[in-house]
């Protein structure tokens, strides 16, 4: 029974680790959009030309 428990913990850890690495790129893109929104860039129309990702969220 203890061996089964260890196998489940190991499998969960491996899946969690690989999922986290796969989502790192998406986190980077999201943090950029959050930074643009915090600066108020998305409310300024000429900013769309230099930051096309900013206007895409609407």
Swiss-Prot record:
Alpha-conotoxins act on postsynaptic membranes, they bind to the nicotinic acetylcholine receptors (nAChR) and thus inhibit them. This toxin blocks mammalian nAChR alpha-3-beta-4/CHRNA3-CHRNB4 subunits. Also exhibits inhibition of D.melanogaster alpha-7/CHRNA7 nAChRs. Expressed by the venom duct. The modification Cysteine amide is found at residue 54. One of its GO terms (molecular function) is ion channel regulator activity. Disulfide bonds join 41-47, 42-54. The cysteine framework is I (CC-C-C). Alpha4/6 pattern. It is found in: Secreted. It comes from Conus aulicus. Residues 17-39 form a propeptide. It comes from the Eukaryota. Residues 1-16 form the signal peptide. InterPro entries: Conotoxin_a-typ, Conotoxin_a-typ_CS. Belongs to the conotoxin A superfamily. This is Alpha-conotoxin AuIB. GO terms for cellular component: extracellular region; host cell postsynaptic membrane. Keywords: Acetylcholine receptor inhibiting toxin, Amidation, Disulfide bond, Ion channel impairing toxin, Neurotoxin, Postsynaptic neurotoxin, Secreted, Signal, Toxin.
């Amino acid at each position: 029974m203890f061996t089964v428990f260890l196998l489940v913990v190991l499998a969960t850890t491996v899946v969690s680790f690989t999922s986290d690495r796969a989502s790192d790129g998406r986190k980077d893109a999201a943090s950029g959009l959050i930074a643009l929104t915090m600066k108020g860039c998305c409310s300024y129309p000429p900013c769309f030309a230099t930051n096309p990702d900013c206007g895409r969220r609407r």
